[in-house]
Amino acid sequence: MVQASLSSPITPPKDTQALQEWLHQLADRIISGYRITKVEALALTEIEGQDQILLLCEAADRIRQACCGNRVDLCSIINIKSGHCSENCSFCSQSVHHPGQDSPVYGLKTSEEIVQQAKAAAAAGAKRFCLVSQGRGLKYNSPKSKEFAEILATVKRITTEAKIKPCCALGELTLEQAQALKEAGVTRYNHNLEASATFYPQIVTTHTWADRVETVKNLKAAGIQACTGGIIGMGESWEDRIDLALSLRDLEVDSVPINLLNPRQGTPLGHLPKLDPFEALQAIAIFRFILPQQILRYAGGREAIMGELQSLGLKAGINAMLIGHYLTTLGQSPQQDQAMLKSLGLEGGEAPIPGEYQP
C-alpha cells in the first residue's frame, strides 16, 4: 500500500482545465493505491460551482470504475419492529422521545410475513434483504426475551426459502450474538456511525459513538461484513464528513450507506432545510476518493433530496443502492431503478467488497 504524503497541492486550481487535470492525477494515484490525506480531502470541499463539482464527480467515477467495476449492489430492507425506540437520535421519527407524525408503531412481525417480503425483494432484483429493528440493540434485550431466537429462525428460513442473502440491522450486539447471526446465515450487518465522533453528541445522547464502534468491531471479529455509513445534511461541517469517512476507512468496513437527511416533521432536525443536490454529489464523490474500494450505497433520502438528479450519484462514486421502500418513507419503484441503471450502462447485482474486484 502506498503511504499518504502531503506532496500534492492542497488547494484545487480554479481554472477548469487545470482542475480537471489535477483531479485526474489525484484519482490515478488513488487507483494505484495511494491513501488520500485529511488535508487533501478537505481541499476537495473547496471546489465550488456545479460545473466544477461535476468534474470532481467524473474523477470519483473513474476511481469507482477502476476499483469496483460496473456492477451496482442492490438490496432491500424491511422494518421488522417499529416505533417507541428508547434512543433519542435527532434524525429519527421512531424515537419515543420525539415520535414523528408519520412513524408507524408495531411489534415484531411474523416470520411468515418477513419471509414473503424477502421473496418479493428477490423478485424485484435485490440480492440482499436486511431485517431492521428499532431499539438500542440486542445486547440490551431481557434474558427472557424470545425475539432474538425468533429472528435467528427467520434468518434461517430466508437462507433456505428465498433466493436472497439475509442481512440484519438490530442495533448494538455482543460478539456472541454476532457469532450466532453468522451461524444462522447473516454475512453482512448494518450498523451506522451516523456522524463523526465530534459531531455525534449533538444528535444523540442516549448512547455514544464509541458504543457503535464497539459493535462494528464485534461484527468484524465474528466474520460478518460491516455495512457502516452515516447521514449527510444534519448540520455537520465538511470536516465532520471527512472525519466520518476517515473513521470508516480506519475500521475497514465493507459497505458504506450514504443517507441524505430527509427532515421528518416532529423530530429535532425536522426544521432543517433539505440538502442541496450538488452538495450531496460533492460529499459522495469525496467519500469515493477516501474509500476507493468500499461499496458506497445510496440509502435513505436519495429520491427526496436528489430528485431528477439521482442518476448523477451513480456517476459520482455510488455503486450500490436500496431499492423499494425505506423504514418510514417510500422509495421509487424497483422498475424505475432498474431502468435508471440500464440507461447508465450499469447492471444490478452484487458489487465486490474491498479486495475482491478483478478487472
Curated annotation (Swiss-Prot):
PROSITE patterns cross-referenced by the UniProt entry: RADICAL_SAM
Cofactors demanded by this protein: [4Fe-4S] cluster; [2Fe-2S] cluster
Cofactor note: Binds 1 [4Fe-4S] cluster. The cluster is coordinated with 3 cysteines and an exchangeable S-adenosyl-L-methionine.
E.C. number: 2.8.1.6
Spans traversing the lipid bilayer: none
Residues reported to bind [2Fe-2S] cluster: C130, C167, C227, R297
Ranges for domain Radical SAM core: 67-302
Amino-acid positions noted as binding [4Fe-4S] cluster in the UniProt annotation, renumbered to this chain: C85, C89, C92
GO biological process per UniProt: biotin biosynthetic process
Single Gene Ontology MF annotation: iron ion binding
Pathway listed: Cofactor biosynthesis; biotin biosynthesis; biotin from 7,8-diaminononanoate: step 2/2
Catalyzed reactions per annotation: (4R,5S)-dethiobiotin + (sulfur carrier)-SH + 2 reduced [2Fe-2S]-[ferredoxin] + 2 S-adenosyl-L-methionine = (sulfur carrier)-H + biotin + 2 5'-deoxyadenosine + 2 L-methionine + 2 oxidized [2Fe-2S]-[ferredoxin]
Key words of the record: 2Fe-2S, 4Fe-4S, Biotin biosynthesis, Iron, Iron-sulfur, Metal-binding, S-adenosyl-L-methionine, Transferase
PANTHER family: BIOTIN SYNTHASE (PTHR22976), BIOTIN SYNTHASE, MITOCHONDRIAL (PTHR22976:SF2)
Subunit structure: Homodimer.
Entry's family note: Belongs to the radical SAM superfamily. Biotin synthase family.
Name of the protein described by the UniProt record: Biotin synthase
Organism, as annotated: Gloeothece citriformis (strain PCC 7424) (Cyanothece sp. (strain PCC 7424))
